[in-house]
């Protein structure tokens, strides 16, 4: 031990193998490789949009989601090799979870690694993401007892409030000086798409007031078949968020398709129910800070996630969650609604999220932990078309035992004993999914007025249609498996029974051979494992007369196999139908061919 003034500090003891600075360099190099590939995927998205390669865009979006874990595993393997034979290597190699505590020398070594890593981030453009990568690699090495700020970045070490790219993250236009029309044309042309515009002067017509300043993020936001310009108008001190949607027409030209105005329009664009954007960002913190000024209600954790930086979103969510726990006193309790057969769900009333644990014993044939986790990963990798809630997945989450309601703790002990560990004043959850809390649709319909019920039932049917068109069959379509968002959108959130449409066989019920068969509780026809009979849906879904009338007005065709068979055939042919996150009244030229069944 060394004393510096009156402060006692531990110097890492000399060990065989790499020094702490070497380890810090290795981890940062792993992150830099990851982020270079991340940016390259956004640059590829631009060329895919220009060429209209929508299947390539979907494939790229799926592949990018897995980049991070691949780079973390790669870096942890390199680190394990570098530390082989070193005193700093933990007792069981690349993982210390379940191993003995670190020695004093190992403790000093790993603390020094973090200190050296902080020094390397002084001029880095993605320091917050690099810190998260450091955490991910370290969590593969250290026991959870060391998951605190001495070893990990539980709190950020580098401030990003005023961090920006070498080339500023947004451009500014002054329509008072050069005219609104010219400013708008230049704003769009500056993105440098290598494909002609259909009629840019027409599209950029005088739709806006002229006495304003326009600030636009310097990169396009690509998702599926669309690209978006995101910015803000500042006029006499008031900020007006906006986004411009770009689409390719059948001739291969780019059109300005829609103008989205205000926080509700942009909140829908950046909804947690949609696929992540592909955006080229040198400095993601600058982009997120800009977006936060447009969407003050949306947590930065969600913004990072929607930009494809879902691990950084997880880090920020966890920090926000710990901060909320410190400044609240209510207890975790069983979530309201009908109990599920697969998940044990609880909530913290003061926090707008639910916590979902897979039950130890699942009372469904062919269903186990691995199957459920595969289904959730399937949703993570899939285009959620605005109809499936995104989730955050966590392991080894330590929560204060005093914050658990007694009935919840008893339920966890009974239903998920393998996923919890009670350790003194702490309850450790070994695996949990966290997602946005929504009003369950069954509860919403029970109390809704006739006009609101009509809208909700129409939304419910639209959700089923759009999921099917995106090659997702919900499986269990009961109302309890759907939720209603703040903006009244119906979203599916129970994934254990989802299947791909192309795996299903939609059939008509054959005529009964006789009256006895028709009255029997057993089917008189053979049923395969993936057979679905849409004629049966009404029996389970339409018991409420109000719901039945509304459903038949808007979605009667969903009760017959023909619609499902036609949809399955289109999906099997590889057709991509886009459901844009805006209504037709946001379109600049409503007379043009509308995007398929857009939704606000």
From Swiss-Prot:
InterPro entries, sorted: AceK_kinase (IPR046855), AceK_regulatory (IPR046854), Isocitrate_DH_AceK (IPR010452)
Binding sites annotated in the UniProt record for ATP: 335-341, 356
Keyword Cytoplasm: yes
GO cellular component: a single term: cytoplasm
Localization: Cytoplasm
Catalytic activity: L-seryl-[isocitrate dehydrogenase] + ATP = O-phospho-L-seryl-[isocitrate dehydrogenase] + ADP + H(+)
Active site (catalytic residues): 390
GO terms (BP aspect): glucose metabolic process; glyoxylate cycle; tricarboxylic acid cycle
UniProt entry keywords in alphabetical sequence: ATP-binding, Cytoplasm, Glyoxylate bypass, Hydrolase, Kinase, Nucleotide-binding, Protein phosphatase, Serine/threonine-protein kinase, Transferase, Tricarboxylic acid cycle
Database matches in HAMAP family: AceK
Biological role: Bifunctional enzyme which can phosphorylate or dephosphorylate isocitrate dehydrogenase (IDH) on a specific serine residue. This is a regulatory mechanism which enables bacteria to bypass the Krebs cycle via the glyoxylate shunt in response to the source of carbon. When bacteria are grown on glucose, IDH is fully active and unphosphorylated, but when grown on acetate or ethanol, the activity of IDH declines drastically concomitant with its phosphorylation.
Name of the protein in question: Isocitrate dehydrogenase kinase/phosphatase
């Amino acid at each position: 031990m060394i004393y510096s003034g009156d402060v006692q500090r531990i110097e890492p003891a000399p060990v065989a193998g790499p020094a702490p600075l070497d380890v810090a360099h290795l981890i940062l190099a792993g992150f830099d490789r990851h982020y270079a590939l991340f940016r390259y995927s956004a640059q590829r998205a631009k060329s895919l949009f220009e060429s209209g390669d929508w299947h390539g865009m979907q494939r790229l979006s799926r592949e990018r989601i897995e980049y991070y874990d691949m780079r973390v595993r790669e870096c942890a393997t390199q680190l394990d090799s570098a530390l082989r034979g070193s005193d700093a290597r933990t007792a069981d190699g690349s993982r210390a979870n379940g191993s003995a505590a670190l020695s004093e020398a190992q403790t000093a070594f790993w603390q020094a690694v973090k200190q050296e890593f902080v020094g390397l981030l002084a001029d880095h453009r993605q320091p917050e993401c690099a810190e998260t990568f450091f955490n991910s690699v370290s969590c593969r090495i250290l026991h959870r007892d060391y998951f605190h700020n001495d070893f990990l970045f539980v709190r950020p070490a580098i401030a990003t409030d005023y961090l920006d790219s070498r080339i500023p993250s947004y451009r500014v236009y002054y329509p008072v000086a050069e005219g609104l029309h010219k400013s708008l044309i230049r704003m769009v042309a500056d993105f440098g798409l290598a494909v002609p515009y259909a009629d840019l002067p027409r599209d950029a017509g005088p739709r806006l007031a002229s006495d304003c300043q326009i600030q636009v993020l310097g990169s396009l936001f690509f998702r599926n078949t669309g690209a978006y310009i995101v910015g803000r108008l500042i006029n006499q001190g008031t900020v007006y968020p906006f986004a411009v949607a770009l689409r390719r027409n059948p001739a291969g030209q780019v059109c300005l398709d829609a103008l989205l105005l205000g926080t509700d329009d942009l909140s829908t664009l950046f909804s947690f129910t949609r696929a992540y954007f592909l955006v080229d960002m040198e400095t993601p913190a600058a982009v997120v800070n800009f977006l936060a000024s447009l969407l003050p209600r949306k947590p930065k954790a969600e913004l990072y996630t929607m930009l494809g930086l879902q691990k950084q979103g997880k880090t920020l969510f966890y920090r926000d969650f710990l901060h909320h726990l410190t400044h609240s006193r209510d207890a975790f309790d069983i979530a309201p609604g009908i109990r599920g057969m697969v998940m044990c769900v609880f909530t913290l009333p003061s926090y707008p999220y639910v916590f979902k644990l897979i039950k130890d014993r699942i009372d469904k044939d062919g269903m186990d932990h691995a199957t459920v986790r595969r289904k959730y990963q399937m949703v993570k990798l899939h285009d959620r078309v605005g109809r499936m809630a995104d989730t955050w997945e966590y392991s080894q989450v330590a929560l204060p035992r005093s914050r658990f309601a007694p009935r919840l703790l008893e339920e966890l002990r009974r239903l998920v004993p393998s996923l919890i560990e009670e350790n003194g004043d702490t309850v450790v959850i070994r695996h949990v999914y966290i997602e946005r809390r929504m009003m369950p649709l069954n509860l919403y319909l029970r109390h809704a007025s006739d006009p609101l019920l009509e809208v909700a039932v129409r939304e419910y049917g639209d959700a089923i249609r759009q999921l099917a068109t995106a090659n997702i069959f919900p499986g269990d379509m009961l109302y309890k498996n759907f939720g209603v968002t703040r903006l009244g959108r119906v979203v599916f959130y129970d994934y254990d029974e989802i299947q791909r449409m192309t795996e299903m066989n939609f059939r008509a019920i054959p005529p009964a051979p006789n009256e006895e068969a028709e009255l029997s509780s057993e089917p008189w026809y053979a049923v395969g494992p993936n057979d679905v009979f849409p004629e049966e849906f009404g029996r389970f879904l339409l018991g409420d007369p109000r719901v039945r009338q509304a459903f038949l007005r808007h979605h009667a065709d969903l009760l017959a196999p023909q619609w499902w068979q036609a949809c399955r055939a289109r999906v099997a042919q590889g057709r991509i139908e886009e459901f844009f996150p805006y209504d037709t009244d946001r379109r600049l030229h409503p007379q043009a061919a509308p995007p398929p069944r857009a939704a606000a």
